[in-house]
Swiss-Prot record:
The lineage of its organism: Eukaryota, Metazoa, Chordata, Craniata, Vertebrata. InterPro entries: Securin_separation_inhibitor. It comes from Rattus norvegicus (Rat). This is Securin. GO terms for cellular component: axoneme; cilium; cytoplasm; cytosol; nucleus. Regulatory protein, which plays a central role in chromosome stability, in the p53/TP53 pathway, and DNA repair. Probably acts by blocking the action of key proteins. During the mitosis, it blocks Separase/ESPL1 function, preventing the proteolysis of the cohesin complex and the subsequent segregation of the chromosomes. At the onset of anaphase, it is ubiquitinated, conducting to its destruction and to the liberation of ESPL1. Its function is however not limited to a blocking activity, since it is required to activate ESPL1.
Length: 199
């Protein structure tokens, strides 16, 4: 089989590509490309780094640095290129378009049944004007509704907060629950311990 021998590019001199004797004997197999000899032999399988025929480079952006001609503006007014239609044809077309398009009221009847949804409506609470919320210490208070009027009146008549006296608010839980009550809630019967080695 004919093999090609190539000289390293650093040491390459013009015309230094060599081919085997079998390749040189085949007259049809030798082609002159750009002043260099190259043997075209059939290759089987993948060939890595083997030189092929020179390919034209692909232009990704088309022609670069090409001067394009600017369209010449004419001083004539633009004319429509539509052919002139008779009055009869125009009236026929207008009646067809009017009959095919539905009336704007009939187009979307479900829009009239649409109710706009505002999520803030569910988070706003209306209070009577006589209650002043600005006097309440509401920092860190969760959003909740109090059903008891006594608790609401108690909240509305609070004095400004003081570091010595902290009012008990109904939504707060006891910060230090009694240990026996907490432990009694944790008493749960567990299944018996199984020491079998089979499991």
């Amino acid at each position: 089989m004919a093999t090609l021998i190539f000289v390293d590019k650093d040491n390459e001199e013009p015309g230094s590509r060599l081919a085997s004797k079998d390749g040189l004997k085949l007259g049809s197999g030798v082609k002159a490309l750009d002043g260099k000899l190259q043997v075209s032999t059939p290759r089987v399988g993948k060939v890595f780094g083997a030189p092929g025929l020179p390919k034209a480079s692909r232009k990704a952006l088309g022609t670069v640095n090409r001067v394009t001609e600017k369209p010449v503006k004419s001083s004539k007014p633009l004319q429509s290129k539509q052919p002139t239609l008779s009055v009869k044809k125009i009236t026929e077309k207008s009646t067809k378009t009017q009959g095919s398009a539905p009336a704007p009221d009939d187009a979307y009847p479900e829009i009239e049944k649409f109710f706009p949804f505002d999520p803030l409506d569910f988070e706003s609470f209306d209070l009577p004007e006589e209650h002043q919320i600005s006097l309440l210490p509401l920092n860190g208070v969760p959003l909740m509704i109090l059903n008891e009027e006594r608790g609401l009146e108690k909240l509305l008549h609070l004095d400004p907060p003081s570091p010595l006296q902290k009012p008990f608010l109904p939504w707060e839980s006891d910060p230090l629950p009694s240990p026996p009550s907490a432990l009694s809630a944790l008493d749960v019967e567990l299944p018996p311990v199984c020491y079998d080695a089979d499991i």
